[in-house]
Design a protein with these regions (language model features):
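Short C-terminal tail/terminal secondary-structure segment
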Residues: 2-3, 146, 235-260
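Substrate-binding pocket helix/loop in short-chain dehydrogenase/reductase
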Residues: 96-109, 204
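Alpha-helical segment proximal to the catalytic Tyr-Lys
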Residues: 125, 169-174, 232
Length: 260
């Protein structure tokens, strides 16, 4: 029997699901037949569509408990269930740890750690009442697993998100599976602002064993796998989607011509 991912008749909520990585996640679920509700603070400039189908957009600040409650109630009123949640909303601007304010650090942690917990709590309450339960995928980052200069609070928050994932997987089992998808560098508009032109993107790609940055669709496909029945025995896991990580610097030296 062929292995297939089919989300027909399934309802998926994707936070931050209208741009960049989030749009890639939304497209993956649309391609697999899901009804996708994508929330963000503002709608996308470009329609998020796949296989002739489009997302349903809802405006929501995921840091606001009341707004999250309204969002969940809207989804339930329209569809009667929530089968999968992908916590993708997050991010951080560059700021050195010694120079950023207390308020700046607090806001970064709020968006990247506390907000995913807030949304997960609201959706878990729904999933626990459903006969088939549900699954949650938290989008994390390699910044939480190695030094993250310039985004210290972000890296700390993502490390916390990975820890949170493993805890929720225990607390909310067996009805709800919870997993973390740890992304590496992804080729988006924001990454190009950070890395510069194509030559800058290519230079970063050369530091990755697979030779390129991830695409939003790479992340989306892996998120869909974690949410799917193919991963029905996977919970509390951390899936690294980083192209092999970062090539150690000594490997470049090891290719030098030492024959002379």
């Amino acid at each position: 029997m062929a292995l297939e991912i089919d989300f027909t008749d399934r309802v998926v909520l994707v936070t931050g699901g209208v741009r960049g990585v989030g749009a890639g996640i939304s497209r993956a679920f649309l391609a697999a037949g899901a009804t996708v509700i994508a929330c963000a603070r503002r709608p996308a400039e470009v329609a998020v569509e796949k296989a002739g189908r489009a997302i349903e957009f809802e405006s929501c600040d995921v840091r606001d408990a009341d707004a999250v409650g309204v969002l969940v109630e809207k989804v339930l009123a329209r569809h009667g269930r929530i089968d999968h949640l992908v916590n993708n909303a997050g991010g951080a601007p560059f700021a050195l740890a010694a120079e950023a304010s207390k308020n700046f650090h607090a806001k970064i942690v709020e968006l990247n750690l506390l907000a995913p917990l807030l949304v997960a709590q609201a959706v878990n309450a729904v999933m626990q009442r459903q006969a088939e339960g549900g699954s949650i995928v938290n989008i994390s980052s390699v910044s939480g697993q190695r030094p993250s200069p310039g985004t210290a609070a972000y890296g700390a928050a993502k490390a916390g998100l990975d820890s949170l994932t493993s805890t929720l997987a225990v607390e909310w089992a067996p009805k709800v599976r919870v997993n973390s998808l740890v992304g590496g560098s992804v080729d988006t508009e924001l990454s190009r602002l950070h890395f510069g032109d194509q030559s800058g993107v290519d230079a970063v790609g050369k530091t990755i064993p697979l030779g390129r940055l991830a695409t939003p669709d790479d992340i989306g496909n892996c998120a869909a796998f974690l949410a799917s029945p193919l991963a029905e025995y996977v919970s509390g896991a951390t899936l690294l989607v980083h192209g092999g990580g970062e090539r150690p610097a000594f490997l470049a030296a090891s290719t030098a011509d030492v024959s002379q």
